[in-house]
Amino acid sequence: MNADHAPFRHYLDLADARLGSQVVAVSDEWFAPASRMLQAGEPVWKEGVFDDSGKWMDGWETRRKRFEGHDQAVIRLGVSGVLKGVDIDTRFFTGNHPPAASLDGCFCAEGDPDDGTSWSEVLPSVELQGDRHHYHAIDDERPWTHLRLNIYPDGGIARLRVYGVPYRDWRSQTPGTALDLAAAINGGRALACSDQHFGPMVNLLKPGRALNMGDGWETGRRRTPGHDWAIIALGHPGSIEAAVVDTLHFKGNYPESCSIQAAFVEDGNEARIEAQSLFWRELLPAQKLEMHHEHRFERQLNALGPVSHVRLNIFPDGGVSRLRLFGRPQLP
């Protein structure tokens, strides 16, 4: 599967170290630590760079195995969730990549797995090649807190991306508590947009402020009438009380203004959501934006009651690093 046929990449990377994901157990990391697999940045090659163990590699690399068995790394996800797909990335590992890999999962309500933990197969053994992405869709609705990456028998992995939907028990949410309903860690999803030439829409919902301009949503320069937009499904329906539109790092390419529309969309109607969104009610009337600035809107919001989806409109084009929608979830 290539990147163009891996739609699950629009989901949150649950193994991202920035979410708090950690390697809690590893069979071997002689040449390079397993923690490097979880770094957010793309792997790099450093020509002629060596350390005490050998050639410096941007990823996890084990020594050559001289006995039976295989290597493995156990990862505690920063956010537990349901997997939609994985990318086992072997970029820059050639001649030292594993021929195959598999993935297991478990759910630990507290703590980390031990010798008595029961593991379930998430991804059966798949063939790996050197210096390339390996995308695999996952069709399993069980949530996981930990994953175990098995490589056969040894070798190096540059990055492990685990795309999925964060798991949250909304029944345990304290009634009346406000939180960011659009945040990816709360189940928010970027569904569609007019353009994402320079930066994907999924970046809008990432935790924390953007690392750089590439860590936001940015459209191409519009040469035709109209404006750009992105549609977001909230992690849970709720009443929005505050909106934050952050243009951090966007200076000569920020939108002149923005507005937000919203609606409560019944289950099963997301397939037609782009056309429907044109007629959604106005949550935030058009507001001027500034470059490299975090804009917070409260009094400007219209009281619409519970909504499940929003449409961020930017005029006419440009970049937004983050969108936050704070509100109180509509609980059973």
Curated annotation (Swiss-Prot):
Instruction: Write down the EC number.
Output: 3.5.3.4
- What GO MF annotations does this protein's record show? allantoicase activity
Q: Which GO terms describe its biological process?
A: allantoin catabolic process; purine nucleobase metabolic process
Q: Which SUPFAM superfamilies match?
A: Galactose-binding domain-like
What keywords would UniProt list here?
Hydrolase, Purine metabolism
**Encoding gene (name):** alc
Keyword Hydrolase on entry: yes
Return the protein name: Probable allantoicase
**Pfam families given in the database record:** Allantoicase (PF03561)
Q: In which pathway does it act?
A: Nitrogen metabolism; (S)-allantoin degradation; (S)-ureidoglycolate from allantoate (aminidohydrolase route): step 1/1
Give the catalysed reaction(s), semicolon-separated: allantoate + H2O = (S)-ureidoglycolate + urea
| Entry-linked InterPro entries | Allantoicase, Allantoicase_dom, Galactose-bd-like_sf
Q: Name the protein family.
A: Belongs to the allantoicase family.
N-terminal signal peptide:
none
Answer whether the UniProt record assigns the keyword Transcription to this protein: no
The organism is: Pseudomonas paraeruginosa (strain DSM 24068 / PA7) (Pseudomonas aeruginosa (strain PA7))
- Top-level taxon: Bacteria
